[in-house]
């Protein structure tokens, strides 16, 4: 069941909003023996989203799911069986008089709240289910039970991609001499976990390999002129430059160097090693407030400015203007919003998905499914800066990390030390316990 019940013997009425169906088109079948109600305005919203570049696929899948039920049962305005429960599209219960004046705005959220409140007024045990944080807050202000849709969410383990092991002096000597050693303590760690190896006489950095041995990570490695300043950054560079790892996830607070590391690794792979043809940086629309490109003034290049500028700012901090000009003139760098990824196959490219914390899980999986031959993808993210309120703290990129950790094609590292400036370090430290 998607949502837990405090009284499992009582049938509850779950009113779903559009965000739930976009996150999981099959969500309607995940409520066990309970009643599922879809307000008619949700169908209208799904129709409006059918051609959305990021969410259109999920809107169409949800509509197909409902249409299959219609074909099977003839009509949906009356409850029809689904699993052990029922589902219906609600055409009535639309009188807004049950709402306080401040919520009678006539928008779609108000219409969904009207349905839920009218059903509750009839004595039903109503729960409004939404991925949208403001929607849940509005429902709670009416005294309605409101819950986040949790099916498919994972329990975050807190895995940072790093571990610390105590080793003998002989172990450390063998690691420096041969480059790899066998450590029993490392065999239970996920593949590609970064290691701080400590002995009485020194320390070293290492990484768990797919065969569970430990490989030395050199601290003096330079990638396109950039050297890691912290243990985590050095491990990150080692992961980024390993062509056998197809997906690298880099998490961390503002100023920890996520984007700089990813861009330098891309420049090294494309310009120096010729491993890929180009760098493609995707940024979600939510990175600058969520506006659609069409609503912004100016030409397409003008509209792209806010998305591209953050990438160029980072490039300017790690390389010279001449290199940036060369990369752009040779068409070796593209900065695109994720609206451009649907229908593309990304071959022979070093792909960076920036601000990945703002992507819903379905959109993120769509991105990863577009990675073609001889391509790699880097996800940079900071879950403390989610601009998309439909993405919870434990879904999206967090779910991907938890599901993929330990696979030889995947690696994750969380950066903890701010390298941007003393001001950024201060803000990161002071605000690290504030969560959304």
UniProtKB/Swiss-Prot annotation:
Enzyme Commission number(s): 3.1.-.-, 5.6.2.5
Pfam families documented for this protein: PhoH, PIN_4
GO molecular function: ATP binding; GTP binding; isomerase activity; metal ion binding; nuclease activity
Catalytic activity: n ATP + n H2O + wound RNA = n ADP + n phosphate + unwound RNA; ATP + H2O = ADP + phosphate + H(+); GTP + H2O = GDP + phosphate + H(+)
Effect of residue 283 to A: No longer unwinds or cleaves 5'-tailed RNA, decreased ATPase activity
Alphabetized Gene3D superfamilies for the sequence: 5'-nuclease, P-loop containing nucleotide triphosphate hydrolases
Keywords, ordered alphabetically: ATP-binding, GTP-binding, Hydrolase, Isomerase, Magnesium, Metal-binding, Nuclease, Nucleotide-binding
InterPro entries: P-loop_NTPase, PhoH, PhoH2-like, PIN-like_dom_sf, PIN_dom
UniProt keyword annotation of Hydrolase present: yes
SUPFAM superfamilies for this protein: P-loop containing nucleoside triphosphate hydrolases (SSF52540), PIN domain-like (SSF88723)
Keyword Phosphoprotein: no
GO cellular component: cytosol
Residue ranges occupied by any PINc domain in the UniProt entry: 12-137
Family stated for the protein in its record: In the N-terminal section; belongs to the PINc/VapC protein family. In the C-terminal section; belongs to the PhoH family.
Biological function: Unwinds and/or cleaves 5'-tailed RNA in vitro, the reaction is maximal with hydrolyzable ATP; double-stranded (ds)RNA and dsDNA are not unwound. Unlike the protein in mycobacteria there does not seem to be an antitoxin gene upstream, suggesting this is not a toxin-antitoxin system. Has ATPase and GTPase activities.
Domain notes: Has an N-terminal PINc domain and a C-terminal PhoH domain, suggesting it has RNase and nucleotide hydrolysis activities.
Protein name, entry field: Protein PhoH2
């Amino acid at each position: 069941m998607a949502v837990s019940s405090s009284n499992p013997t009582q049938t509850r009425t779950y009113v779903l909003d559009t965000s739930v169906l976009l996150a999981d088109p099959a969500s309607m079948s995940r409520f066990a023996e309970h009643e599922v109600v879809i307000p008619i305005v949700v169908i209208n919203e799904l129709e409006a989203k059918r051609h959305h570049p990021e969410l259109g696929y999920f809107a169409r899948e949800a509509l197909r799911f409902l249409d299959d039920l219609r074909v099977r049962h003839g009509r949906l305005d009356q409850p029809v069986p689904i699993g052990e429960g029922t589902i219906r599209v609600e055409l009535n219960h639309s009188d807004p008089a049950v709402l306080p004046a401040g919520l009678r705005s006539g928008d779609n959220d108000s219409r969904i709240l009207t349905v839920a409140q009218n059903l509750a007024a009839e004595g039903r045990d109503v729960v409004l289910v939404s991925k949208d944080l403001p929607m849940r807050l509005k429902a709670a202000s009416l005294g309605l039970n409101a819950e986040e849709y949790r099916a498919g969410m994972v329990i975050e383990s807190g895995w940072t991609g790093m571990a610390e092991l105590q080793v003998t002096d002989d172990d450390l000597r063998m690691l420096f001499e041969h480059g790899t050693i066998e450590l029993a303590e490392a065999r239970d760690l996920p593949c590609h976990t970064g290691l701080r190896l400590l002995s009485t006489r020194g320390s070293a950095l290492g990484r768990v390999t797919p065969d569970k041995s430990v490989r030395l990570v050199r601290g003096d490695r330079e990638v396109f002129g950039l050297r890691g300043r912290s243990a985590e950054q050095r491990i990150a560079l080692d992961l980024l430059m390993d062509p056998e790892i197809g997906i690298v996830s880099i998490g961390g607070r503002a100023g920890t160097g996520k984007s700089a590391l990813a861009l330098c690794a891309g420049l090294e792979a494309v310009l120096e090693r010729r491993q890929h043809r180009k760098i493609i940086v995707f940024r979600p629309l939510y990175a600058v407030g969520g506006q659609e490109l069409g609503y912004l003034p100016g030409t397409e290049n003008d509209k792209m400015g806010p998305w591209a500028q953050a990438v160029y700012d980072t490039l300017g901090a790690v390389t010279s203007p001449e290199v940036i000009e060369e990369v752009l003139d040779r068409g070796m760098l593209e900065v695109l919003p994720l609206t451009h990824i649907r229908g593309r196959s990304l071959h022979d490219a070093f792909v960076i998905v920036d601000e990945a914390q703002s992507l819903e899980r379905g959109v993120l999986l769509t991105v990863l499914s577009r990675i073609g031959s001889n391509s790699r993808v880097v996800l940079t993210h900071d879950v403390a800066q989610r601009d998309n309120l439909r993405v919870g703290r434990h879904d999206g990129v967090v779910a991907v990390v938890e599901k993929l950790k330990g696979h030889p094609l995947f690696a994750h590292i969380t950066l903890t030390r701010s390298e941007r400036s003393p001001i950024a370090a201060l803000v990161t430290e002071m605000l690290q316990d504030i969560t959304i």
